[in-house]
Amino acid sequence: MKIKYRSYNLRFKHPFTISRGTKTHQPTLIVELEHFGIKGYGEAPAISYYDLPVEKMIEDLETKKAFIEKFSFTDPERFWHYCHHLFPKNSFLVCALDIAGWDLFGKMKRKKLYELWGLDISKNPMTDFTIGIDAVDVMVDKMKETPWPIYKIKLGTEHDVEIITELRKHTSSVIRIDANAAWKADEALEKINAFKHLGVELIEQPLAKDDWEGMKFLFKRSPLPL
């Protein structure tokens, strides 16, 4: 088996802002596995707060590249297990290799992944389209640019309720909210009570990941699923 890789800095169509900051590009690693002339592709993004940049993925991959190329590829699950032990501290790289392994296996068997897994895609849940924090008129324009049945709206500002109030005027689609840990418990409850009357379906990551007491408080009182 042969392996190739390439790094990209993918430019977003629009700047993407959440409560932690703004991104205009996404650093990404693409890997290619080739086995008897058939190629499979996988990718992994670099997310800053996980401290695993693309450069680290490449460095780790280079140190064990020969082991991957010597692997006798017959089963993607076995390949994942092998990669998991090769790179125990780099789950993003393992993910890219795992995706490439499944893509390769599907092409070898001439089957789509859902066929390999025995899935009925007619029952797939609908994914949401994410809109980052911006001036509210820009957020409205993004909704109009991409009509969608479910929107995830990034929040974490002093004007969160006003933003959702305005967006609701322009769509009847389901709205989900992701605060990316921007709120405190009391603030979150106040906002969630307002969102309940604006047709919001659920709230994602309202509080800091280690605020267990706040989550306990909010879970008992929130009128919306968390």
Sequence positions of predicted segments:
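Catalytic pocket of metal/acid-base enzymes, prominently hydrolases
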Residues: 105-129
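Short, acidic/polar
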Residues: 132-146, 158, 186-190
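Active-site mouth loops of central-metabolism enzymes
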Residues: 123-135, 154, 180-184
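Structured beta-strand/loop patches that form or line metal/cofactor-binding pockets in enzymes
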Residues: 1-50
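Flexible, glycine/charged-enriched surface loops at secondary-structure junctions
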Residues: 76, 113-114, 202-206
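Conserved, mostly hydrophobic/aromatic
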Residues: 31, 37, 97, 110, ...
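Catalytic core of soluble alpha/beta enzymes
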Residues: 153, 158-226
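Metal- or metallocofactor-binding catalytic centers and their adjacent structured scaffolds
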Residues: 33-34, 39-108
